[in-house]
């Protein structure tokens, strides 16, 4: 797990529990081998007509389209340079933050990070792992309300990242006792991953 790409997506900045847990985790690694991208502090463009057409354009690109493709290429290069992705994915209204979804929309590119074959889709990013730290106000793990786990497993697997470890910090809005237990459980899980 030597080279890490860290993706933070919480809008809460220094108050974010997912960011704090991720920071605690990455402190166990060589800081020279870590790239941190705070998607809330450095927002990415939303998938709209301009972005979609730029990522699918053939032939000569406009300056705006080229800027979008260059950004997408940079994000994909960050993944390729890493051994492990560490993703902070707090639950907002049962799903991931918009900021993380914007990143996904820019890295999921046909012919670049996945392709279609006669056997179905095939991810083109291989040999990578992902650790996903997901924080929730309530208790959702293994429940129908946990949309994050299957979604991120699916989208990461679609681009070829199939070794995915989830770390859950739950019940954070259910009082101090529950919150402290949820955070302690997540910290223990993360510590075990550094061993």
UniProtKB/Swiss-Prot annotation:
What's its top-level EC category?
oxidoreductase
What EC number(s) are associated with this protein in UniProt? 1.6.5.-, 1.7.1.17
Which cofactors, if any, are listed as required? Answer: FMN
Give the catalysed reaction(s), semicolon-separated: 2 a quinone + NADH + H(+) = 2 a 1,4-benzosemiquinone + NAD(+); N,N-dimethyl-1,4-phenylenediamine + anthranilate + 2 NAD(+) = 2-(4-dimethylaminophenyl)diazenylbenzoate + 2 NADH + 2 H(+)
Q: Which InterPro entries match?
A: Flavodoxin_fold (IPR003680), Flavoprotein-like_sf (IPR029039), FMN-dep_NADH:Q_OxRdtase_AzoR1 (IPR050104), NADH:quinone_OxRdtase_FMN_depd (IPR023048)
On whether Oxidoreductase is a keyword of this UniProt record, the answer is yes
- Note on how the cofactor is bound: Binds 1 FMN per subunit.
Taxonomy, superkingdom: Bacteria
Q: What's a Gene Ontology MF term here?
A: FMN binding
Q: Which key words are in the record? A: Flavoprotein, FMN, NAD, Oxidoreductase
Q: Where does FMN bind?
A: 10, 16-18, 91-94, 135-138
Q: Which Gene3D superfamilies match?
A: 3.40.50.360
Subunit-structure text: Homodimer.
Give the protein's recorded name.
Answer: FMN-dependent NADH:quinone oxidoreductase
């Amino acid at each position: 797990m030597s080279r890490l790409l860290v993706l933070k997506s919480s809008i809460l900045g220094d108050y974010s529990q997912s960011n704090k847990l991720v920071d605690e985790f990455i402190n166990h690694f060589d800081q020279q081998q870590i790239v941190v991208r705070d998607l809330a502090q450095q927002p990415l463009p939303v998938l709209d007509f301009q972005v979609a057409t730029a990522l699918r354009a053939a032939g000569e690109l406009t300056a705006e389209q080229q800027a979008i493709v260059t950004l997408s290429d940079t994000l994909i290069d960050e993944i390729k340079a890493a051994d492990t992705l560490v993703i902070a994915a707090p639950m907002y209204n049962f799903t991931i933050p918009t900021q993380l979804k914007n990143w996904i929309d820019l890295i999921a590119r046909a012919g670049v990070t996945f392709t279609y074959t006669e056997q179905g889709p095939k991810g083109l990013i291989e040999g990578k792992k992902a650790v996903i730290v997901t924080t929730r106000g309530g208790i959702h793990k293994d429940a129908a309300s946990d949309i994050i786990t299957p979604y991120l497993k699916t989208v990461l697997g679609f681009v070829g990242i199939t070794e995915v470890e989830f770390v859950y910090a739950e019940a954070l809005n259910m009082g101090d006792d529950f919150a402290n237990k949820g955070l302690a459980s997540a910290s223990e899980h993360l510590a075990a991953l550094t061993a």
